[in-house]
Design a protein with these regions (language model features):
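Mature extracytoplasmic/periplasmic domains
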Residues: 178-239
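A ligand-binding cleft/hinge motif common to bilobed small-molecule-binding domains
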Residues: 1-4, 141-158
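Periplasmic-binding protein-like
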Residues: 108-117, 155-179
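Conserved C-terminal helix/tail region of periplasmic/extracytoplasmic solute-binding proteins
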Residues: 235-302
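Short secondary-structure boundary segments
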Residues: 55, 83, 146, 206-207
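Extracytoplasmic ligand-binding site segments that recognize negatively charged/polar headgroups
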Residues: 1-138
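Structured segments of extracytoplasmic/periplasmic soluble domains
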Residues: 4, 8, 17, 73-74, ...
């Protein structure tokens, strides 16, 4: 999104003289693809997309879990799936060994075909509802965001979260200043305040997302810093995660079109049942009418 806002001139460049606390931002969260020189944004939180699942019902070692589990028919009607094309396509793309930023038309078509094949076993396409459904045990498995997964796991101890071994999306929430802002210096001072170690620590401790702030990270309890949900192995992060960048208009249009076709195919499948049921109902109705007429004619005779 930041990359898109930069291209559309929706955000303005930052004056780092007003943001000295940027020095606390870890090197591996600087100069990411969406803002290569950090001219427009300061990282705020980060996390990974992974899989949350009921480990009492899914007896697979965490290190063996990969994205293809979301296509496993053993979990028919117990799988939740993201209800937005970018996240859903990313899962199918990684499953196929593609980049989650691919613009290759054939690769997008292949990802869409996989999503269409998966649809039959998916209980629901949802976003925020994943929290309630997984927390209540209404589903067994779903893709989800690490920070939110930690919150659900506090409420339901049968749940576990794993980052699939083949890789995933690394998301970074960042602070920017809109082009329309008339108080740029004040906004920069606020960003600096949010990067103050004590403030950044208190914020992260409350919202449970991961911090890119080295001083705030050092203040975290040892069990938090070593939790693989919040802070996966850094070698894995470097080798197996990718941030989203803005796709071309053509790729976005193709993805959206394929997504719409995939979702509407669900209705088409439903319609294949409607017509036969309607015809059967008509036949039954006609038979009933004929039977009533026959009975009535007999009564009239006698």
């Amino acid at each position: 999104m930041i990359n898109k806002m930069i291209k559309e001139k929706m955000v303005q460049k930052l004056d780092y003289d007003n943001i000295p606390n940027f020095k606390y931002i870890m090197p591996n969260f600087r100069n990411l693809e969406y803002d290569p020189d950090n001219e427009y944004s300061v990282p705020y939180t980060w996390g990974t997309v992974g899989i949350i699942y009921d480990e009492t019902m899914i007896d697979i070692p965490p290190e063996e879990i990969d994205w293809d589990i979301l296509w496993n028919e053993d979990y028919l009607d117990n799988i939740l799936m993201f209800d937005n094309p970018r996240d859903a396509f990313a899962i199918a793309e990684i499953k196929n060994g593609f980049s989650l930023n691919t613009e290759d038309s054939d690769e997008l078509i292949k990802a869409a075909e996989d999503l269409k094949a998966q649809k039959r076993i998916v209980q629901a396409y949802v976003m925020d509802e994943i929290f309630d459904k997984m927390g209540a045990g209404d589903a067994l498995i779903a893709p989800y965001y690490a920070g939110d997964a930690l919150t659900i796991m506090d409420e339901n101890d049968s749940l576990n979260f794993v980052v699939p071994k083949s890789g995933t999306n690394l998301f970074v929430d960042a602070m920017c200043i809109p082009t329309s802002s008339k108080q740029k210096e004040a906004a920069e001072m606020y960003i600096n305040f949010m990067c103050e170690p004590d403030i950044a620590y208190a914020n992260i401790d409350y919202i449970c997302y991961s911090t890119p702030n080295s001083a705030a990270y050092d203040k975290l309890d040892e069990d938090v810093r070593t939790n693989p949900v919040s802070y996966p192995d850094q070698d894995f992060i470097g080798e197996k995660t990718t941030v989203f960048v803005n796709l071309s208009d053509e790729a976005n249009l193709q993805m959206q079109t394929l997504w719409t076709e995939m979702k509407s195919a669900e209705d088409e499948n439903a319609n294949t049942w409607i017509m036969p049921v309607f015809l059967i109902a008509c036949i039954v109705f006609m038979i009933a009418v004929q039977v009533r007429r026959y009975i009535k004619s007999k009564k009239d005779i006698f």
